[in-house]
């Protein structure tokens, strides 16, 4: 039986030095000493693969140039496989691991659309398999504090939720170490669901579902191309209807100059409203219908974000993206320990196939709405 003092062993598939997300997963998984990355097939490029292993202290005998060989050789020696390849390559790896009954931690988006979800469902058994998808923004302490406030009814009956994630990367690629970080080739092609929805939209869907604990019932959407990359959706606007007459909107963009990552949540009830901005993650803006305005941070009267696990350093020292990701990895660790011990205990912050499916169905409906120029219903 696993206890919460034991490190679990991970093998990475993808996520090398030349990956967009690999180093973040490596750092976040180990920040709280819950996991150790002990094996990997980090890159198809042998030099990058070897360099990544050396950088991360992975022994050459646990380094593989082929992910299938990694699975075969390490399946009895690691506790989970982490899938960090580009999204279009997820499906083959996921189905292979499920058929072998091996635990999976998968970078979002899970796959490229509902058709590939159906392939997963054909070999997935929720009572037998472990599949966690990493949506890290709900790992921020003040987002979790907001969820706590909503459950307490602090904002009253929710009426509106607006989520946005504007970025400028297609118009102004970030300069990293003197080199422009150009979009990866796979991001310049759309699939069953447009790639911008796989990249940014699934985060917005996750946050809305996490906070409201419900799915939208219908959407109307407008897709646009504003970049130099032809026939590629790079800007999406969506209106949403939810149960209980809740209205919502989502905006995601890769061509919004001035926004490195402008992720923002605004939520309105009949007693108050809240705003959280990812570039100022330790503050939650609250407004009440008696005129009070409040900025709540970890040093304030928090009832959830004041936990020790969210305060690796005392308030006044801002937390960041990797720490939020590490919060999620700790949640995954706890649920994975229960799974490996044969106990059925679900963590409230770990999400898998069902939410991934709902998100991809939403954006498939948005694509259809853009084509029909009309509202599209979402069916469970």
Segments from the language model and where they lie:
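Rossmann-fold dehydrogenase core element
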Residues: 119-137, 157-159
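Hydrophobic residues in well-ordered beta-strands that form the structural core
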Residues: 106, 112, 131-133, 276
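C-terminal helix-rich "cap/oligomerization" subdomain common to oxidoreductases
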Residues: 1-7, 80-82, 327-380
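N-terminal Rossmann-like dinucleotide-binding module
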Residues: 1-58
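Beta-loop-alpha module in the N-terminal Rossmann-like domain of NAD(P)-dependent dehydrogenases
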Residues: 61-123
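Glycine-rich, aromatic-lined ligand/substrate-binding cores of catalytic
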Residues: 200-282
């Amino acid at each position: 039986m696993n206890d919460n003092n034991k490190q679990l062993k991970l093998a990475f598939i993808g996520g090398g030095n030349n990956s967009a997300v690999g180093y973040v997963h490596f750092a976040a998984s180990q920040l709280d000493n819950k996991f150790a990355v002990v094996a990997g097939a980090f890159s198809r490029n042998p030099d990058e693969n070897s360099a990544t292993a050396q950088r991360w202290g992975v022994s050459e005998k646990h380094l593989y140039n082929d992910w299938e060989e990694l699975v075969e050789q390490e399946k009895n020696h690691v506790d989970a496989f982490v899938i960090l390849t580009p999204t279009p390559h997820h499906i083959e790896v996921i189905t292979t691991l499920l058929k072998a009954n091996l635990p999976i931690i998968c970078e979002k988006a899970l796959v490229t659309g509902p058709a590939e979800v159906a392939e997963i469902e054909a070999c997935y058994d929720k009572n037998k398999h472990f599949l966690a998808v990493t949506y890290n923004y709900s790992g921020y302490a003040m987002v979790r504090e907001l969820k706590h406030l909503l459950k307490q009814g602090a904002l009253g009956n929710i009426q509106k939720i607006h989520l946005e994630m504007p970025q400028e990367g297609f118009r102004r690629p970030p300069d990293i170490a003197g080199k422009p970080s150009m979009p990866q080739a796979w991001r310049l092609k759309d699939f069953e669901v447009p790639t911008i929805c796989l990249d940014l939209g699934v985060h917005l869907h996750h946050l809305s579902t996490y906070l409201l604990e419900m799915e939208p019932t219908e959407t109307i959407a407008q897709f646009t191309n504003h970049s130099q990359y032809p026939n590629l959706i790079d800007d999406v606007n969506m209106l949403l209807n939810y149960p209980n007459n809740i209205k919502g909107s989502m905006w995601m963009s890769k061509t919004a100059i001035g926004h490195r990552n402008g992720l923002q949540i605004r939520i309105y009830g009949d007693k108050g409203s809240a705003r959280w901005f990812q570039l100022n993650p330790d503050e939650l803006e609250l407004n009440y219908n008696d005129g009070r305005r409040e900025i709540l941070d970890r040093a304030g009267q928090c009832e959830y974000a004041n936990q020790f696990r969210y305060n690796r350093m005392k308030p006044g020292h801002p937390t960041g993206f990797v720490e939020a990701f590490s919060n999620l990895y700790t949640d995954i660790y706890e649920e994975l320990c229960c799974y490996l011990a044969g106990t059925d205990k679900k963590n409230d912050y770990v999400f898998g196939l069902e939410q991934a499916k709902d998100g991809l169905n939403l954006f498939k409906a948005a694509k259809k709405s853009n084509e029909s120029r009309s509202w599209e219903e979402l069916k469970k």
